[in-house]
Amino acid sequence: LRVVGGNLTAKQLAKIAEVAEKFGDGHVHLTSRQSVEIPFVKLEQIDAVKAALAEGDVEPGVCGPRVRTVTACQGEAICPSGCIDTYALAKELDARYFARELPHKFKFGITGCQNNCLKSEENDWGIKGGIQVKWREEDCIQCGVCTKACRSGAITHEDGKITVGESKCNFCGRCVK
């Protein structure tokens, strides 16, 4: 089924459960790509299944050489480490590219921070959120919290100035949260 960024509404979940009971064997499979499958549906019932799912705003997914379900972690909306709105980006990519035919299957994966829970590099096009930090003297109160928060040791504090070592920074954003 088409699941954008791993998000389904309660209405969609209820309809999927209803269809699984009526046309399948009463269970669903949650795929590794954040989608849902209803196994054991008879081929001659596919049109009825699609119609029933549409009543709950659920659309079929795709297979074969096409752009697949866009996966995303929960991003900044829920995760304290999140740096970007992963769901908004997933919806945008889905609207532009979902089911587009290509020479081979194609997967998007969006992760909101450097924790990389979605393993963005394992997708054909992976997006990893981050924050590029610049020190502004007029905004700094010299408290040292940013230096302590930086796990990669990219931030140093000397002679009243903060330096962000770009080669060490992993763009996690902990220093500004």
What kind of feature is each model-predicted range?
Residues 145-162, 168-177:
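Iron-sulfur cluster-binding cysteine motifs and their immediate structural context
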Residues 135, 164-165:
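Hydrophobic face of beta-strands forming the core of extended beta-sheets/solenoids
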Residues 84-86, 124-128, 151-163:
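Short cysteine/histidine-rich zinc-coordinating motifs and their immediately flanking basic loops
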Residues 2-133, 139:
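Small-residue-enriched alpha-helical segments and adjacent helix-cap loops
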